[in-house]
Amino acid sequence: MKTVDVIVGRINEGEYVYSVVMDAPEVPFGLNGTGRTVDEAKADFLDAYKEIRDIMDEECKQYEDLSFNYKYDIPSFLNYYAHILSLAGLEKISGINQRQLSHYINGTSKPRKSTVERFSKKLKSFAEDLCSIDVI
């Protein structure tokens, strides 16, 4: 099984708000999905994957099974995890103030590459801290 990157991002076209696109030029087909929520877009993406596998089976073409590593842009991440992580909490984790995070969510401001890297690094550090905790 091969693991490929999949980009989850916000789009502002028509009724769909989120897009999920496979970022794997080495794979002989492309995949994408769209939806009003990240979950809908992921489900649409996985449906497309099932459909392409069915087509390849019908045409007797071989393919490698894929697993997916989802990568989020900051607005999509903030929206997807908003029910778990508050902006106040994310400010403490990332050092980016709530107002700026809110601008990212609303699309009124776009983070610089250095901000994205810092946000990702701080978030992963927080996740590592959580993984090292044992509750007794």
Residue map of PLM features:
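DNA-contacting interfaces and partner/effector-binding or oligomerization modules
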Residues: M1-E58
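Short, basic, alpha-helical segments at the C-terminal edge of helix-turn-helix-like DNA-binding modules
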Residues: R118-L123
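Short, charged, surface-exposed hinge/linker loops at domain edges
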Residues: M1-D5, D47-V116, D129-V135
